[in-house]
Amino acid sequence: MTECKAEVTPSASNGHRVFSYTLESHTAAAFAIMNELRRERQLCDVTLRVRYCPLDTHVDFVAHKVVLASSSPVFRAMFTNGLKECGMEVVPIEGIHPKVMGRLIEFAYTASISVGEKCVIHVMNGAVMYQIDSVVQACCDFLVEQLDPSNAIGIASFAEQIGCTELHQKAREYIYMNFSQVATQEEFFTLSHCQLVTLISRDELNVRCESEVFHACVAWVQYDREERRPYVQALLQAVRCHSLTPHFLQRQLEHFEWDAQSKDYLSQIFRDLTLHKPTKVIPLRTPKVPQLIYTVGGYFRQSLSFLEAFNPCSGAWLRLADLQVPRSGLAACVISGLLYAVGGRNNGPDGNMDSHTLDCYNPMNNCWRPCAHMSVPRNRIGVGVIDGMIYAVGGSHGCTHHNSVERYDPERDSWQLVSPMLTRRIGVGVAVINRLLYAVGGFDGTHRLSSAECYNPERDEWRSIAAMNTVRSGAGVCALGNYIYVMGGYDGTNQLNTVERYDVEKDSWSFSASMRHRRSALGVTTHHGRIYVLGGYDGNTFLDSVECFDPETDSWTEVTHMKSGRSGVGVAVTMEPCHKELIPCQC
C-alpha cells in the first residue's frame, strides 16, 4: 500500500478548511521514471563525453541536466551560471574514468551506489571532484572499515591529498593506536624522514615501551641506509630516549653502527640515566585508549579478591576478574600495560597467611596468570619499577619485619635479591624518580618511622635521605614530577590526613594541603598529572571515598566512592580492558 500523510487544518477566517496530502514515495518513484527515460534516451538534454586522458577513447553518457544539477554542485554551477556548458548538448569531460562517471550518474538517479576494494579510491576521487558529499561519506566509511596495518599509511596519505579530513583523522588515529604493527609494513618504509619525525613525535602513539619506537626508526634507516643516514640525529631527537633503559641503550651502542654525533648523543643519555641526573619531565605517551585506575584486593572484615577499575573521565566503575586468592596489604604496579599484584596477606575465617605470590593481570583478555614467587612472603609491602623490573621492598612475614629487597625481571620470570635497606620497614611507601628508588616511613617492629632512604641500582646500595616531619606507617606514597608525595598514614596514636612533599634536588620536606579525610593503609596512584587516594582506615571506619589532589592549586577534591570501604588495597593505572563482558559496579 502506498504510504501517505494527510492533514486537515482548522477553518480559516473565510470558513475554508485546507486538506494537505503528501505521498512519501513520490520522489523515489519520479526519479525511477526519470532513470527509465535516461536509459531509453528520452527527454535527455545533455551528453557527457567522458575520457580519463586526452588520448583515451571517450564514452558518451546521456542524462538530464536537472538531475545532474540536483546531485552535484559542480554540475549545478556548470548548467546554471551562464557558463559555456549551459548551451552545449555535448559536454566534454576529462580527468575521471568513464566507469566512475557512470556510477555517479547512476547514483544521481537512484541514490544507490556500490563500492569495493578495487574501485573505492577512484569513486571517491570522482565524488570529491564533483562534490557529491553523500558518496564521499560512503567511500570514507568503507575505507575506515578496511583500515589495517598494511594500508593505513596509504589511506591517510590519500585522504590528505583529496582533503577528506574525517578519513585522514581516522586513518591517523589507527596508525597511532597500532603503531608497532604499522611499523613492520612496507608502507612505513616509504615515509619521508619529515613524515616519520612527525609521526613518532605524537603523544598519542600506543606503544608498550619507547624501545618499540626506537626499533622502528632503526629499521626505517636500515631500509635505505646510505640515503637515510643523514636523518638519524633528527629521528633520535624525536624518540623519547630518556624513557629507555640504560641496558637497552648500551646494547644499541654496541650492536649498531652509529655516526659520531648520534653515538655521542646516545652516550650522553646513557650517562644521564646511570648518574640519575634530573632531567626535564619527559612527556608521556598518551594513547587515546582510556587509562583507568585499577584497585585490587584490600581488607573489609576479611581480605578481598576484588579487581575493579575507575574511569576518572566518565566516573564509571567496572568489576573485573577476581584474584584467585584474596589478599590485603598487597602492592600493585604496571609494566608494559600489564598489572602486577605483589605480596600481601590472606586474612580469612580459617586464619591468616602472608603471601609470596606475584600475579599478572592482562587488560586485553581480563585474565590473571601466576608468576614466579618471591623468596619470602611480604605483607604490607612497597613496590617500585625501574627499567621494567619490579622492586619488592620490605614487608613482613609473621613476626619478621623485612629489610630485604628483591627484584623481578618479567622477561625471565625470576626474582633476584638486591642489597637490603638500612632499616626494617613494613607499611613502607615506595616511589621512583630519576631511576632511584625511595623507601619512606613504615614500622620497624618497635617504632613508626619518619626516616627515608634511597636505592641506587647501579651501585646496588642504599643511603639515608632527609627524614619526614612526621612519623608514618601505612602512608600513601607516589612520585609526581620531581617530587615525592606522602599522604596520611598512622603515627602510633592517630590516623593522619596531613601531606608532605619531598624535593629530590634539595633533599628537603615541606607540607602540602591536607586530605579531607584521615587515612592509613590507603591506595594511591597518579593519573593525568593528579594524585588519587582511595579507601583506607580512619580509626573507626573502612573508607570508600576517593580524593584527588591537584598540584597546581594545592587542593583536594572528593571525586567518587568505591563499591565498598576497604583498606590495604593495591592501586595502579593502565589501559581500559578490552574484554566486552564486564560488570558495571553498582556504587
From Swiss-Prot:
Give the top-rank taxon of the lineage listed in the UniProt record for this protein. Eukaryota
| UniProt KW keywords | Cytoplasm, Kelch repeat, Nucleus, Repeat, Ubl conjugation pathway
An example GO CC term for this entry is: Cul3-RING ubiquitin ligase complex
InterPro entries registered for this protein in UniProt? BACK (IPR011705), BTB-kelch_protein (IPR017096), BTB/POZ_dom (IPR000210), KEAP1_BACK (IPR047098), KEAP1_BTB_POZ_dom (IPR030563), Kelch-typ_b-propeller (IPR015915), Kelch_1 (IPR006652), SKP1/BTB/POZ_sf (IPR011333)
Domain BACK: start-end pairs: 153-253
Q: Which terms under GO biological process does the entry name?
A: cellular response to oxidative stress; cellular response to prostaglandin stimulus; cellular response to xenobiotic stimulus; larval feeding behavior; proteasome-mediated ubiquitin-dependent protein catabolic process; protein ubiquitination; regulation of autophagy; ubiquitin-dependent protein catabolic process
Q: What does this protein do?
A: Substrate-specific adapter of a BCR (BTB-CUL3-RBX1) E3 ubiquitin ligase complex that regulates the response to oxidative stress by targeting nfe2l2/nrf2 for ubiquitination. Keap1 acts as a key sensor of oxidative and electrophilic stress: in normal conditions, the BCR(KEAP1) complex mediates ubiquitination and degradation of nfe2l2/nrf2, a transcription factor regulating expression of many cytoprotective genes.
Its domain comment says: Keap1 contains reactive cysteine residues that act as sensors for endogenously produced and exogenously encountered small molecules, which react with sulfhydryl groups and modify the cysteine sensors, leading to impair ability of the BCR(KEAP1) complex to ubiquitinate target proteins.
This protein is called what? Kelch-like ECH-associated protein 1B
Native source species: Danio rerio (Zebrafish)
Report which gene this protein is encoded by.
keap1b
